[in-house]
């Protein structure tokens, strides 16, 4: 487009039907798990997974998420977010700026300072939106990152699985972290209960 390299994400035909079939199978597995161990209500887990997976089929939503992250991370130079080409994108076609970079694993033999810099950038890309705005990038696999320059920072490439949580959930994360840090079982249990877990036993927590 105007001689500029772009990244194009095109949805496979009939993906919606394939996704619904997989989610139905998952519901059956969760129902079986509830009968074997009712301590964790897997119905809410199934609803959450279903909602996130269905959202990934909506590329307009993903475009909005990419813009949101570009705004959130605008003052974090070690994390780059591709721009969205709205005039070329649709609900099943997403067109983004092409960000030059190399695979994350190609830097695993780099010096310690470089690896620390990359790891810090990855942490900030995940933690800053979550801790400040309760927004989490829910698909942090290696294919969703590349590294630009000589380990100067990361390109964050995929925004299909983004979750905005209520403040209560973030409080649960903080409680869990502090409970584990202090070996405080009561605080750990409270954190899990905040997330909807019930009738917790020590063996489940451990």
Where are these regions (language model features)?
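Conserved catalytic cores of large enzyme domains
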Residues: 1-206
């Amino acid at each position: 487009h105007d001689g500029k390299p772009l990244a194009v994400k095109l949805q496979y035909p009939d993906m919606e039907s394939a996704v619904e079939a997989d989610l139905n199978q998952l519901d059956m597995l969760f129902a079986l798990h509830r009968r074997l161990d009712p301590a964790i209500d897997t119905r809410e887990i199934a609803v959450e997974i279903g909602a996130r997976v269905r959202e990934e089929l909506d590329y307009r939503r993903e475009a909005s998420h990419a813009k949101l992250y570009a705004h959130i991370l605008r003052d974090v130079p070690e994390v780059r977010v591709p721009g969205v080409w709205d005039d070329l994108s649709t609900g099943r076609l997403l067109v983004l700026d092409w960000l030059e970079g190399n695979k994350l694993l190609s830097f695993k033999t780099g010096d310690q300072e470089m690896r620390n810099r990359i790891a810090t950038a990855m942490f900030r890309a995940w933690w800053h939106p979550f801790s400040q705005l309760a927004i989490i990038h829910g698909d942090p696999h290696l294919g969703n990152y590349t590294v630009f320059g000589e380990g100067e920072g990361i390109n964050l490439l995929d925004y299909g699985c983004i979750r905005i949580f209520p403040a209560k959930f973030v409080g649960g994360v903080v409680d869990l972290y502090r409970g584990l840090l202090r070996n405080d079982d009561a605080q750990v249990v409270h954190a899990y209960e905040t997330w909807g877990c019930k009738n917790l036993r020590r063996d489940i927590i451990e």
